[in-house]
Amino acid sequence: MSNIKVGQFPSTRLRRLRMKDFSRRMISENNLSTNDLIWPIFVCEGNNIADEIKSMPGVFRYSIDNILKELENVINLKIPAVALFPQIDNSLKDENGSQAVDENNLICRSIKTIKQNFPDIGVICDVALDP
């Protein structure tokens, strides 16, 4: 049998870059803040609606008038953008996706209302015309 030689590593590894909190923060690769977040908002037709989505407990689908109340929370949390997910009636969906170019569709009305009240927030959206 041959003797296996162990490497010449020190018994103590001096991790000088991890010793102090300030240096750990300076060299960390990833930092997550509210600036990195996008708040999802589910939108539906109607007035004064806040219906819980059964498959996502604690998550609600809001009518346009109630979106503004939700956006106040988003602004207070300093989240820079929202993503809108509309609930489009199946009768409005067609093979050409004509709802996508209708300036009075649910998503366009939602964006107009949001931008009139919160012009600085970013809005990401989906016309939700999938079958």
Please annotate each region the language model reported.
Residues E72-I75:
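Non-catalytic positions within long, well-ordered alpha-helices that form the structural scaffold/packing
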Residues T34-L37, L77-A81, F118-I121:
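Short, well-ordered coil/turn segments that N-cap beta-strands
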Residues A50-I64, K78-N105:
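Glycine-rich, proline-tolerant flexible connector loops at the mouths of alpha/beta enzymes
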Residues M1-S28:
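N-terminal amphipathic/basic leader segments beginning at the initiator methionine
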Residues S2-Q8, G46-I49, I88-N90:
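Generic detector of short, locally flexible boundary/turn motifs and exposed helical patches
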Residues L32-V59, I124-P131:
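N-terminal small/glycine-rich loop or linker at the start of catalytic domains
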Residues K93-C125:
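Alpha-helix-loop-beta-strand connector modules within alpha/beta enzyme cores
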